[in-house]
Amino acid sequence: MHGWALDAYTRPNGRTQIGELINVIKYRLHNDPSLASIQAEVLLQILKRFLVRLFPISNRPFDCLMHPPSNTERQFHLTDFLANKLSSPSILNRSRELVKVRDHETVKIMSGKERVKKIPGSMQLIPNIDLPKPRGILLIDDVLDTGNTAKEACRAVEVVWPGTPRYYVSLTYLLDRGTSR
């Protein structure tokens, strides 16, 4: 798997534009989809610029987009918004095929040790049999903390589509991972 984070976000030492936008969208505007989508558009443009620089449209190694299953308590899901907006006839959003098969508390409140115990085995890929196996998958996430969610999503993909190249992009990662828990 190849992976990138567009930004480094740190709680005690400073905030970044991307980190602040994610925070506002996820925790203040999550139940106001119209306002959240306006803010999310900024993140979408940043992500598009990154992807075009890294993978020119004519040479994209993936034809599938996915994001880990979201917290269903929100009315607006940032990663779903991004995957839907990035999808096209040649790059399909197949996120609905990656499902949570075991519930656990919100990842944000779990310690690193709890994540290692609770996240593995919590996702399953149930492929749409009417669609071909993708030649490559771009996994999109909003915040990378311990990496356990990304690992679990990749594990679920590997079970069904072994050897399929995976590319992971997170909008931001926490520089102070694990120190606040």
For each feature predicted by the language model, list its residue ranges:
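Glycine-rich phosphate-binding loop and adjoining helix at the ATP-binding site
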Residues: 79-95
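Glycine-rich phosphate-binding loops at beta-strand->alpha-helix junctions
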Residues: 69-79
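A short, structured active-site edge motif that brings together acidic residues
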Residues: 66-70, 93-106
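Active-site-facing substrate-recognition patch
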Residues: 1-61, 100-133, 176
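Short glycine-rich phosphate-binding loop at a beta-alpha junction
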Residues: 59-70, 137
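Short acidic, S/G/P-rich loop/turn micro-motifs used as interaction or catalytic elements
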Residues: 28-29, 72-73, 144-147
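PRPP/pyrophosphate-binding module of the type I phosphoribosyltransferase fold
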Residues: 104-181
